[in-house]
């Protein structure tokens, strides 16, 4: 799930106008952004699930630090702390919660590959409901998040534009971009 994270960020933006959209998009992808250096150094890894050819939902992700429950809490708190002096307490909390939402949304689709503790300390059971096994359902949920987020963003931004006596075309253009890029990302992910 990547497109769904961005759809959720747009949905949050529709309710939290003081937080920049780009900051919410960054927060939604924060765990994956931090995953990249861990992956590049071999600390975390990806593996094709047995009996599959890879592609959408057919990977086992060993992101034992960035995608552990406790790791998510730490990373969300770090991002919120970075944002606190820039946008204030409320916005920092919102950004931290959006970063944490990444883990919750991943929990729905991931196989049981998400540990509770960083490094899978104590070897507790890994979590994940595995909706990726049903790629059509997973893709439908992501599509719904993208479209709902784009629609909610458009409604809120259009209303704000009209209240400020601005032309609401920019709001429509951004909403269309959110929906288009979200669906395109999902299509590329599913068709890989």
What do the predicted segments below correspond to?
Residues 1-192:
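N-terminal membrane-targeting hydrophobic helices
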């Amino acid at each position: 799930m990547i497109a769904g994270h961005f759809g959720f960020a747009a949905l949050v933006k529709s309710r939290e106008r003081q937080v920049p959209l780009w900051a919410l998009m960054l927060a939604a992808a924060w765990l994956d952004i931090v995953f990249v250096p861990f992956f590049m150094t071999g600390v975390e890894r990806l593996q094709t699930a047995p009996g599959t050819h890879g592609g959408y939902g057919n990977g086992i992700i060993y992101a034992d630090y960035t995608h552990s429950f406790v790791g998510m809490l730490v990373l969300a708190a770090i991002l919120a702390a970075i944002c606190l002096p820039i946008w204030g307490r409320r916005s920092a909390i919102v950004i931290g919660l959006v970063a944490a939402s990444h883990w919750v949304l991943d929990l729905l689709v991931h196989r049981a590959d998400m540990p509770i503790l960083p490094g899978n300390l104590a070897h507790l059971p890994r979590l994940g409901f595995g909706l990726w096994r049903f790629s059509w359902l997973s893709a439908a949920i992501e599509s719904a998040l993208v479209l709902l987020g784009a629609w909610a963003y458009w409604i809120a931004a259009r209303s704000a534009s009209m209240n400020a006596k601005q032309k609401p075309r920019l709001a429509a253009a951004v909403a269309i971009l959110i929906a288009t890029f979200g669906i395109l990302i999902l299509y590329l992910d599913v068709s890989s």
